[in-house]
Amino acid sequence: MIKEEEFFSTDEKVISNTINSYTSLIKQKYGNIIKRVILYGSWARSEGDSSSDVDLLVITSKVPVKTKLDIIGTACSYFTKTDVYLSIKVFSEDEFEQEKDYSFVRTILQEGRQIV
């Protein structure tokens, strides 16, 4: 979880609360399926502002595509409540491992902050 004291501005507190709320919800809803959640992108680099989306990578055990879409869909409700756009990518552990040599995943591993 992101500690609220890590952030200082109102925007950052809203972001922190939204990330914590979303990750708690998917952990509660999907349990042991959720293996890791990693914050990456501008907020992970402390460069986010009120116009920035929040990039989260959710790593799961092997699940059907429908479950991945449900995990992504769960994030949509947060935009209407908070104006925070959660941009969710979902990879299984195997997919994440296979993608480690690609720049997208390498960047996440370098700059990302593990939330769960």
Where on the chain are the PLM-derived regions?
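Catalytic core of pol beta-like nucleotidyltransferases
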Residues: 1-35, 44-50, 60-116
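Short beta-strand->loop micro-motif that forms the acidic, two-metal-ion catalytic signature
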Residues: 55-58
